[in-house]
UniProtKB/Swiss-Prot annotation:
Chain positions of motif Nuclear localization signal: 29-33
Activity regulation annotation text: Regulates splicing of its own pre-mRNA according to its kinase activity; increased expression of the catalytically active form influences splicing to generate the catalytically inactive splicing variant lacking the kinase domain. Leucettine L41 inhibits its kinase activity and affects the regulation of alternative splicing mediated by phosphorylation of SR proteins.
The protein's enzyme class: transferase
Compartment list: Nucleus
Pfam families attached to this UniProt entry: Pkinase
Protein name in the entry: Dual specificity protein kinase CLK1
Natural source organism: Mus musculus
Residue ranges occupied by any Protein kinase domain in the UniProt entry: 160-476
Highest taxon listed in the record's lineage: Eukaryota
Basic residues: compositionally biased ranges: 26-36, 112-137
Subunit organization: Interacts with PPIG and UBL5.
Residues that hold ATP according to the record: 166-174, 190
Higher taxonomy: Eukaryota, Metazoa, Chordata, Craniata, Vertebrata
MF-aspect GO terms: ATP binding; protein serine kinase activity; protein serine/threonine kinase activity; protein serine/threonine/tyrosine kinase activity; protein tyrosine kinase activity
Gene name for this UniProt entry: Clk1
Keyword terms: ATP-binding, Kinase, Nucleotide-binding, Nucleus, Phosphoprotein, Serine/threonine-protein kinase, Transferase, Tyrosine-protein kinase
Length: 483
């Protein structure tokens, strides 16, 4: 039986449904990071206040420019995505997003749905009493926002002893726990708010994770493993394996210095392999970004970099896992018009031309160049400006895509309606340049990486490289020599 997919409201905090974001440094508090599309669909009833734009800081030396460019991007993320540095498993990275529930004919997903329905059958017929009990219980067990009040030493489900709070957001909180039934292993438990819409989103993510974990029980394809889920005092709790920092948080804590080429190669191959697994299972992730790519372990070595005049961290083991399947969509489900976080959003999504698996490939291309540079090449919150940045980096948009789009306000006479001499136009011209000009070296491996990125950033989704093809790209040949 096909169950309905809830309408996604971009004003819900996108990071709130992502396991990845909670794996950041625990020394800072996180702010709420809202979905970048929130400012584009004001009809949603959950309103977020606007913030002012921040501009690229120019400085005298090349090193200073690179550093300030990265700082600009971080400030941009803070301003326009509600990003807050800080706790592992949480908000910017945090992508336990409030997305729609899935509709699929697959028995694995519908069986969970029916099980959940039967479990709450009685309370559904006594909604008034249920809401009264919930409100009353919050004075004892929940805070005013619906978070479960808990502290170190508390035990969930007579099994998971809380040792630390890793992060907190609109969806709930994530805690690190000791699993006393499995030899004291450490796990991450997401405790969802006792609020209907967040519970529904959690159920949607559980369904996808159950399917993926059953299909790949040993995590060969590097999707995060959900160990189990349970209810605790009205809160859905999802138990995950404990992972390291997100790749974004590692870059951020490393002063926005990029990854080494050999690490980029290994990470890129694992990401492509993981997402290709999703695609082969008729799923599109729809929210790939560095915050949703987590290191299995984020141990690092540190040495002084005389060129950058600061200490530089090098990850010891670049193995990764992909997280946050709250927005993953099956081929036969309803496809929301707007998906993906702004920086990683494909042109067919911006132009409302419809999307499928190729939108994930575009996102991966954006991720790889961010790993290479240390910052995103599309730092914007505006669709018209985003398209202008694309044209500056990748050349003119294809005429057939312009002619098909319903977003006519972005175009005039089948060309992007963009004034290069305006302040915004000058900013884009200064901030962006043709793709190959971002190359830091003309060495063969750099050429191969940019060839792969260029194929991933093909405008036309029908011509964009598939991940099955990408895994055979010459950039990955050195990996195959060692296997």
């Amino acid at each position: 039986m096909r169950h309905s997919k809830r309408t996604y409201c971009p004003d819900w905090d996108e990071r709130d449904w992502d396991y990845g974001t909670w794996r950041s440094s625990s020394s800072h508090k996180r702010k709420k990071r809202s979905h970048s599309s929130a400012r584009e669909q004001k009809r949603c009833r959950y309103d977020h206040s606007k913030t002012t734009d921040s501009y690229y800081l120019e400085s005298r030396s090349i090193n200073e420019k690179a550093y300030h460019s990265r700082r600009y991007v971080d400030e941009y993320r803070n301003d326009y995505m509600g990003y807050e540095p800080g706790h592992p498993y949480g908000e910017p990275g945090s992508r336990y997003q409030m997305h729609s529930s899935k509709s699929s004919g697959r028995s694995g997903r519908s069986s969970y749905k029916s099980k959940h329905r039967s479990r709450h059958h009685t309370s559904q017929h006594h909604s008034h009493g249920k809401s009264h009990r919930r409100k009353r219980s919050r004075s004892v067990e929940d805070d005013e926002e619906g978070h479960l009040i808990c502290q170190s030493g508390d035990v969930l489900s007579a099994r998971y002893e809380i040792v630390d709070t890793l992060g907190e957001g609109a969806f709930g909180k994530v805690v690190e726990c000791i699993d006393h039934k499995v030899g004291g292993r450490r796990v991450a438990v997401k405790i969802v708010k006792n609020v209907d819409r967040y519970c529904e989103a959690a159920q949607s993510e559980i369904q996808v994770l159950e399917h993926l974990n059953t299909t790949d029980p040993h995590s060969t394809f590097r999707c995060v493993q959900m160990l189990e889920w349970f209810e605790h005092r009205g809160h859905i709790c999802i138990v995950f394996e404990l992972l390291g920092l997100s790749t974004y948080d590692f870059i951020k804590e490393n002063s926005f210095l990029p990854f080494r080429m050999d690490h980029i190669r290994k990470m890129a191959y694992q990401i492509c392999k993981s997402v290709n697994f999703l695609h082969s299972n008729k799923l599109t992730h729809t929210d790939l970004k560095p915050e949703n790519i987590l290191f299995v372990k984020s141990d690092y070595t540190e040495a002084y970099n005389p060129k950058m005049k600061r200490d530089e961290r090098t990850i010891v083991n670049p193995d990764i896992k992909v997280v946050d399947f709250g927005s993953a969509t099956y081929d036969d489900e309803h496809h929301s018009t707007l998906v993906s976080t702004r920086h990683y959003r494909a042109p067919e999504v911006i132009l409302a031309l419809g999307w499928s698996q190729p939108c994930d490939v575009w996102s991966i291309g954006c991720i790889l160049i961010e790993y290479y540079l240390g910052f995103t090449v599309f730092p914007t919150h505006d669709s018209r400006e985003h398209l202008a940045m694309m044209e500056r980096i990748l050349g003119p948009l294809p005429k057939h895509m312009i002619q098909k789009t319903r977003k006519r306000r972005y175009f005039h006479h089948d060309r992007l309606d963009w004034d290069e001499h305006s302040s915004a136009g000058r900013y884009v011209s200064r901030r962006c340049k043709p793709l190959k000009e971002f190359m830091l070296s003309q060495d063969a491996e750099h050429e191969l990486l940019f060839d792969l990125i260029g194929k991933m950033l093909e405008y036309d989704p029908a011509k964009r490289i598939t991940l099955k093809e990408a895994l055979k790209h010459p950039f990955f040949y050195p990996l195959k020599k060692h296997t």
